[in-house]
């Protein structure tokens, strides 16, 4: 009986997983069409000459590039949030050495295509790329763009993060944490030091300290460093 029950539960799980996969597939198709204001056939045609082996190219972990072959597009999709003042630099990376052939489309050497779009989001810009240009993917990663820090993006919520929900929770977990945890602790230190003086214009010393504690303690590596420092100080 237990064996039959296990088989039935396994069957149900497999059906659920297949439904989820189909839903994600449709979501990715609709997102690509919506973002770049074209149709799926046009996107597939633009990247038809991309070798499938391109998907095995080693690429930097941040911001991350997803191969879109599962929806018939032989290209990488990249999405990240950046600060507003970084946007011109980002756009120039996309446009440099490429011919603009449409509102969202750039071409290099005839067969290297890039689709680009952007939208305002939380004191910054959300940028999207669809490209078979590996050099561009690496250049974007090397430029080290970053999302607006939480004390700007969510200034109105304050530094308390114990009860995040909705858009704020999604932003912290999928935008900020993804960027922040990609940095080393030394790089995090440098990031904060670079922004200390500008934060003085709208945050008191006490508020700044509260924001730093809230942001930094989200990272397990930083919490471990605090524990190590505490143990060392007690000796």
Feature locations, PLM:
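Polar/charged low-complexity regulatory segments
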Residues: 2-235
